[in-house]
């Protein structure tokens, strides 16, 4: 018998999960002898959260924002205190931020400080409307915080960075 798993996720993860699910299905069968088929459901993160909260049967849910997971939590499908299981009451998710630069990296962009320079433009979605862009914003904030900068200095860096967004 083949086991079916429904993975409800947000749009930008479609291709990632297509590749990952194929590898996982093969791995699972090799390890257990059991066949598994993963069914994907993709859409906007907020829409997917509402679908699950309103009854879409999901075995795995991966969404862009903690608020979307909270929508599911509010419907009592997961423990309302789920964030308390993680450091700093954080969302259980990671995201890797990559800087794509012109061929040869003519401006020698290496880290977040370089994105603050006046000769650099940043292309990213708007953090007010995009879950992925919020991760970008948080990654930048964490970078500056990790260097021990004050909240005031970090806020100024973030204002400068947002002005660079296109």
Language-model features, listed with the residues they occupy:
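Ligand-binding pocket segment of bilobal, Venus flytrap-like solute-binding proteins
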Residues: 147-166
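Early extracytoplasmic/lumenal segment of secretory-pathway proteins
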Residues: 1-75, 85-86
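Soluble non-cytosolic domains of exported or imported proteins
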Residues: 14-18, 63, 106, 127-134, ...
């Amino acid at each position: 018998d083949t086991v079916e798993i429904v993975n409800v996720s947000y749009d930008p993860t479609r291709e990632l999960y297509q590749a990952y699910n194929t590898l996982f299905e093969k791995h699972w069968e090799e390890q257990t002898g059991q066949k598994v088929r993963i069914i994907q459901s993709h859409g906007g993160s907020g829409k997917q959260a509402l679908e699950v909260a309103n009854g879409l049967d999901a075995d795995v849910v991966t969404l862009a924002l903690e608020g979307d997971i909270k929508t599911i939590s509010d419907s009592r499908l997961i423990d309302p205190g789920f964030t308390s299981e993680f450091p700093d009451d954080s969302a259980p998710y990671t995201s890797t931020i990559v800087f794509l630069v012109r061929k040869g990296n003519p401006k020698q962009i290496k880290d977040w400080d370089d994105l603050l320079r006046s000769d650099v433009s940043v292309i990213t979605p708007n953090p007010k409307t995009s879950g992925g862009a919020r991760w970008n914003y948080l990654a930048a904030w964490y970078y500056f915080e990790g260097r021990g900068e004050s909240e005031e200095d970090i806020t100024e860096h973030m204002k400068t960075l947002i002005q660079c967004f296109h």
